[in-house]
Amino acid sequence: MKKAFLTLLLITNLNLVFSQETNSAYDEKLAKSLNADERGMKQYVFCILKTGSNTTATAEEKNNLFKGHMDNITRLAKEGKLVLAGPFMKNDRNYRGIYIFNVATIEEAKALVATDPAVKANIFEVELTPWYGTAALQETLKIHEKITKK
């Protein structure tokens, strides 16, 4: 009985050892460059932009604010602080767009959204939430540049 138990224990332990295989496509250098954990993930801050309280801005003011908003997005992306940005389609929640910031804390993200003229002018309000996602998201902009004609 003792021999059967030890054999079963050995088989179970061997099964556990071999089930912990490393992904053969794993690129340690890339993972380190993206600050990926062992799952290929990292922490970001997710931001939802919602319609703000400023309903009195003129068309010209809005145009200037949106130009500044887009310029700010471009700057943050070039700095590596913003890995994803884009508008929502029309919806009943007053959601206008999203940002995913390549920072670890809400405080860092607050400092970044404070540089957006449309947020400063209350055209947009923001909700910030810590988010855990693929570290590969940081490569999205490089790919986007290759598929954008204009």
Residue ranges, per PLM feature:
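Bacterial Sec-dependent N-terminal signal peptides
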Residues: 1-22
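Conserved, structured core segments of small domains
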Residues: 20-150
